[in-house]
Swiss-Prot record:
GO terms for cellular component: cytoplasm. GO terms for molecular function: 1-(5-phosphoribosyl)-5-[(5-phosphoribosylamino)methylideneamino]imidazole-4-carboxamide isomerase activity; phosphoribosylanthranilate isomerase activity. This is 1-(5-phosphoribosyl)-5-[(5-phosphoribosylamino)methylideneamino] imidazole-4-carboxamide isomerase. CDD domains: HisA. Its EC number is 5.3.1.16. Keywords: Amino-acid biosynthesis, Cytoplasm, Histidine biosynthesis, Isomerase. InterPro entries: Aldolase_TIM (IPR013785), His_biosynth (IPR006062), HisA/PriA_Actinobacteria (IPR010188), Isoase_HisA-like (IPR044524), Isoase_HisA-like_bact (IPR023016), RibuloseP-bd_barrel (IPR011060). Belongs to the HisA/HisF family. It comes from Bifidobacterium longum (strain NCC 2705). Its main location: cytoplasm. GO terms for biological process: L-histidine biosynthetic process; L-tryptophan biosynthetic process.
Length: 241
């Protein structure tokens, strides 16, 4: 089974950045978000994971930059939009901008009834981001705790969630390898598809994730590993085939 790869473009204050463990203030600046996204599209990406960090942290938004990327590149690549989607207005804006899929994080924990209604309405165009420390969920830009992972999944499964984007916060941006055990535990407890996020630092990490395909891990988000040139997207796509 092949693995779908989603190069990440995280946007803060109008720039493409990478964070360490999701912490505000730990940014490394990588320049223009549009140029970053275009680089990955030209290198063969079929999906882009586009994150508005300001919206996630409640420090504003980067809608203009995100809209430019979706408008200019949306006919060449599928875009998964994440960050600050927690009500009808922000969800509608993301979908109307042309996102193929929208990733809901904090709202899934703070407003389960709303989350259930949008999963029912939009189906597989809505994924739920599970940002995890141990077996505890992190909420609102990873600054607060949001409850037990598996209890939350039980509810989300019951309302028909079709995809989880699973991030081990301790691994994210640290180039220390993905949490294969966590990914396995999540995938084995749900019929939903699972996207792996956080910690991928070498091609062998992708090979390890690919081995989980038969239990439902069908995709992986690539962030710092690409920006730090640990490997090229072309090399990763070859492994993912």
């Amino acid at each position: 089974m092949s693995l779908t790869l989603l190069p990440a473009v995280d946007v803060r204050d109008g720039k493409a950045v990478r964070l360490r463990q999701g912490e505000s203030g730990s940014e490394t600046d990588y320049g223009s978000p549009f140029e970053a996204a275009r680089t990955w599209v030209e290198a063969g990406a079929e999906w882009i994971h586009l994150v508005d960090l300001d919206a996630a942290f409640g420090t504003g938004n980067n809608r203009d930059q995100l809209r430019e990327i979706v408008h200019e590149l949306g006919d060449r690549v599928n875009i998964e939009l994440s960050g600050g989607v927690r009500d009808d207005a922000s969800l509608d804006a993301a979908l109307e901008a042309g996102a193929a899929r929208v990733n809901i994080g904090t709202a899934a924990l703070e407003n389960p009834d709303w989350t259930a209604s949008v999963i029912k309405k939009y189906g597989d165009r809505v994924a739920v981001g599970l940002d995890v420390r141990g077996h505890t969920l992190a909420a609102r830009g990873w600054t607060r705790e949001g409850g037990d992972l598996f209890e939350t999944m039980k509810f989300l499964d019951s309302v028909g969630c079709s995809r989880y984007v699973v991030t081990d916060v301790a691994k994210d941006g640290m180039m220390s390898g993905p949490n294969i055990q966590l990914l396995s535990e999540v995938a084995e407890r749900t019929d939903a598809k699972v996207t792996a996020s956080g910690g991928i630092s070498k091609l062998d990490d992708l090979r390890a994730i690919k081995e989980l395909a038969e239990i439902g891990v069908d995709s992986a988000i690539l962030g710092k590993s690409l920006y730090a040139r640990a490997f090229t997207l072309q090399e990763a796509l070859e492994v993912a085939k």
